[in-house]
Amino acid sequence: MKIHDCCSTADGLVVGVQRHEAVSQHCAQRAVEAVSGVLGRYRFGGSLRLRLQRIMFADDGIVAQLNYRSPRVTVRIQVPIVAEDGIEAIADRLDCHIRRQLTGRPLRSWPDPQRPVVGFVSECRPITRRKRFHLMVLEPHIAAAVMDTFDFDAHLFIDAETGQDAVVYWAGPLGVRLARQSKMAPLSTAGMMTVNPIPTLCLSEQAAIQRVCMYGLPFLFFTDVRDGRGRLLYRRYAGDLGLVQGRATAPGR
């Protein structure tokens, strides 16, 4: 069961909170106070949506997802915490993201100690969230910046250099890696990231699910056998799976 709360602060910040019934109101209030304290220092006003839900595969685990929008910055963060002891981690991550946007600092470092990989072996789990978007046509380094801004583990987009679906994701040795469907052209922005040299697997949706769950993968970028488009299948904190796919036909096909 989901519980919705809404409030506003003295500096004009409008706050909406959605929490799972297993997450106490006291925990939600502490989280609101922590992030409001950060935003109060910047005096941006704006609107904040905070969602708190239990992590089904971790005792006392909570995942906090925060979306903040103001005339100055737009921030999305997602961070797992252990019970109420990790509330400050939400505020710290928000502060870091805002400062990086305001100062133009480089992408966050990887590995990220606040965001352990959500990957574990399990029986085949269902896809409980499907996201269909008109994918943005981006240069790979811009896609990496979008991934960082919205605190994604991986980001699906149309690669401006090849015209194909592609993903960027956090991985060594440079922190960001690019995976393309089949065209393994060298990057025009050399040194920004590494490129996965292996063409993307062509799979059915069910085969992709089996691969993620059998091998404990946090996500899988694959080409769907039905239409030849790229898909991003990922493990959710709730334990089930999510799928991201594009709506429009990619250019250059």
Report each predicted region and the residues it spans.
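N-terminal, polar/charged subdomain of small-to-medium soluble alpha/beta proteins
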Residues: 1-253
